[in-house]
Amino acid sequence: MLSITILFLLIAEVSSQNYTGNPVICLGHHAVSNGTMVKTLTDDQVEVVTAQELVESQHLPELCPSPLRLVDGQTCDIVNGALGSPGCDHLNGAEWDVFIERPTAVDTCYPFDVPDYQSIRSILANNGKFEFIAEEFQWNTVKQNGKSGACKRANVNDFFRRLNWLTKSDGNAYPLQNLTKVNNGDYARLYIWGVHHPSTDTEQTNLYKNNPGRVTVSTKTSQTSVVPNIGSRPLVRGQSGRISFYWTIVEPGDLIVFNTIGNLIAPRGHYKLNSQKKSTILNTAVPIGSCVSKCHTNRGSITTTKPFQNISRISIGDCPKYVKQGSLKLATGMRNIPEKATRGLFGAIAGFIENGWQGLIDGWYGFRHQNAEGTGTAADLKSTQAAIDQINGKLNRLIEKTNEKYHQIEKEFEQVEGRIQDLEKYVEDTKIDLWSYNAELLVALENQHTIDVTDSEMNKLFERVRRQLRENAEDKGNGCFEIFHQCDNNCIESIRNGTYDHDIYRDEAINNRFQIQGVKLTQGYKDIILWISFSISCFLLVALLLAFILWACQNGNIRCQICI
């Protein structure tokens, strides 16, 4: 009973203590109830006040025709457009930054193949324009303008608009053709020509008389010679024969020679190549809309200022880097330490060592004070601005470090080049893995710097106040100072703005500091004494209970029997 009485007396004594009257000023920083988790170099989960998402995961469900010029191939791919297939007439003279090939594009003329399809496709796409220059070719004693039922234009037999099918003359003659074209211009010329492969020997002689035929095309630096491959093939649009298309680039001052005794699909002119143009091609089913975006993917356009995206690895234009991560957050505020609901028994103010302040909305750092005139809170704009200046532009610097304007297009290969395709995919996957790792490391590094900077500014502000107050106040260890002289609101303001004069209050502070006072219990000591008192009370209660049991056993009131 004695111990319980002591416990209640201690609680009553502690509870009766009031604020000592000495002014207190605390330094703190902004906090929010729910911060954002970011990753740093040393910790995967650090809570900060604010952060910005760096990975774009949203895209438009359409392709934007501005500012990049888009040309929709519709039912035509770019090679059929260059050949002049029926249904591709809308591409005549077309000019583009991005040529849109549709997965539904189909061949609409005589069945053909291109042995080096990917190269000619890339050349045409990069050129950015179908600028065809017609030329006069003098073919002797042969019939020109051959047509096919597989190549209908307005339900009439026709052929590729940019090519001339040469067959034997009505007099059953196909003499040796040898024709030269000199490039006297100031640009490179692209000639597309072909070789017809009949399905039978009879077809060969009916069309060209000579069996076998031969086609040789030469420049000063190259020569391509093709002998037709006669043989039956599966019917495509009613045709068992095939055409193989080839291409030759003739530089200024060079010349091209066509030599044939049959089977030549001759050009009607050439395409002007623009070495300065850097256009490209995109294969997608996404429709063209009316939006504005500099970045296109096969899933749609992206409108963002974020440096990374995880929408598609296939992207064209001024696009964010593709990374595997779905989220990378850049810290744009300080470390978040949410404010406690209550502080000890009396709700005394506390500084940044214990927690942040959710009410500090005008700045990142600030002061709280308690004096005879009451309590107050004020932001410190100077330290706030110093931290903001170091963090501002962080996103721009991050974008500059990843500011490679590029397009990443999925490569297409013939089946025979499967090993090259596997190697290409491995290289691309490795590049993406590397970029993803670099992005994560770069963001973690910037986040570490942000947290270090904001912590440093808090410490600088604390040291500035400590140097001002010196022995006029005592550091309480929680980010607060207890001031040993009278300090009204004007005095508090002088501490905040750095104009506090230590010498004015020095004598008063020294007298108060060394004045003999009773024992003054701080909040931490009160809690300790309460726990000690509680422990002693429990111990005394147990001891009294044991003493009672022993006394009862001795008097025979309680019998204790132990069985083994």
From Swiss-Prot:
<dbReference type="GO" id="GO:0019064">
    <property type="term" value="P:fusion of virus membrane with host plasma membrane"/>
</dbReference>
<feature type="disulfide bond">
    <location>
        <begin position="109"/>
        <end position="151"/>
    </location>
</feature>
<keyword id="KW-0261">Viral envelope protein</keyword>
<feature type="glycosylation site" description="N-linked (GlcNAc...) asparagine; by host">
    <location>
        <position position="34"/>
    </location>
</feature>
<keyword id="KW-1133">Transmembrane helix</keyword>
<keyword id="KW-1170">Fusion of virus membrane with host endosomal membrane</keyword>
<dbReference type="GO" id="GO:0039654">
    <property type="term" value="P:fusion of virus membrane with host endosome membrane"/>
</dbReference>
<feature type="glycosylation site" description="N-linked (GlcNAc...) asparagine; by host">
    <location>
        <position position="497"/>
    </location>
</feature>
<feature type="signal peptide">
    <location>
        <begin position="1"/>
        <end position="16"/>
    </location>
</feature>
<keyword id="KW-1032">Host cell membrane</keyword>
<keyword id="KW-0472">Membrane</keyword>
<dbReference type="GO" id="GO:0075512">
    <property type="term" value="P:clathrin-dependent endocytosis of virus by host cell"/>
</dbReference>
<dbReference type="GO" id="GO:0055036">
    <property type="term" value="C:virion membrane"/>
</dbReference>
<dbReference type="InterPro" id="IPR013828">
    <property type="entry name" value="Hemagglutn_HA1_a/b_dom_sf"/>
</dbReference>
<dbReference type="GO" id="GO:0046761">
    <property type="term" value="P:viral budding from plasma membrane"/>
</dbReference>
<keyword id="KW-1168">Fusion of virus membrane with host membrane</keyword>
<feature type="site" description="Cleavage; by host">
    <location>
        <begin position="343"/>
        <end position="344"/>
    </location>
</feature>
<keyword id="KW-0812">Transmembrane</keyword>
<keyword id="KW-1015">Disulfide bond</keyword>
<keyword id="KW-0325">Glycoprotein</keyword>
<dbReference type="GO" id="GO:0046789">
    <property type="term" value="F:host cell surface receptor binding"/>
</dbReference>
<comment type="subunit">
    <text>Homotrimer of disulfide-linked HA1-HA2.</text>
</comment>
<dbReference type="Pfam" id="PF00509">
    <property type="entry name" value="Hemagglutinin"/>
</dbReference>
<keyword id="KW-0946">Virion</keyword>
<dbReference type="GO" id="GO:0020002">
    <property type="term" value="C:host cell plasma membrane"/>
</dbReference>
<comment type="function">
    <text>Binds to sialic acid-containing receptors on the cell surface, bringing about the attachment of the virus particle to the cell. This attachment induces virion internalization either through clathrin-dependent endocytosis or through clathrin- and caveolin-independent pathway. Plays a major role in the determination of host range restriction and virulence. Class I viral fusion protein. Responsible for penetration of the virus into the cell cytoplasm by mediating the fusion of the membrane of the endocytosed virus particle with the endosomal membrane.</text>
</comment>
<keyword id="KW-1043">Host membrane</keyword>
<comment type="similarity">
    <text>Belongs to the influenza viruses hemagglutinin family.</text>
</comment>
<feature type="disulfide bond">
    <location>
        <begin position="295"/>
        <end position="319"/>
    </location>
</feature>
<dbReference type="GO" id="GO:0019031">
    <property type="term" value="C:viral envelope"/>
</dbReference>
<dbReference type="InterPro" id="IPR008980">
    <property type="entry name" value="Capsid_hemagglutn"/>
</dbReference>
<feature type="glycosylation site" description="N-linked (GlcNAc...) asparagine; by host">
    <location>
        <position position="310"/>
    </location>
</feature>
<comment type="function">
    <text>Binds to sialic acid-containing receptors on the cell surface, bringing about the attachment of the virus particle to the cell. This attachment induces virion internalization of about two third of the virus particles through clathrin-dependent endocytosis and about one third through a clathrin- and caveolin-independent pathway. Plays a major role in the determination of host range restriction and virulence. Class I viral fusion protein.</text>
</comment>
<keyword id="KW-1167">Clathrin- and caveolin-independent endocytosis of virus by host</keyword>
<keyword id="KW-0449">Lipoprotein</keyword>
<dbReference type="InterPro" id="IPR001364">
    <property type="entry name" value="Hemagglutn_influenz_A/B"/>
</dbReference>
<feature type="disulfide bond">
    <location>
        <begin position="76"/>
        <end position="88"/>
    </location>
</feature>
<keyword id="KW-0732">Signal</keyword>
<feature type="lipid moiety-binding region" description="S-palmitoyl cysteine; by host">
    <location>
        <position position="563"/>
    </location>
</feature>
<keyword id="KW-1161">Viral attachment to host cell</keyword>
<keyword id="KW-1165">Clathrin-mediated endocytosis of virus by host</keyword>
<keyword id="KW-1162">Viral penetration into host cytoplasm</keyword>
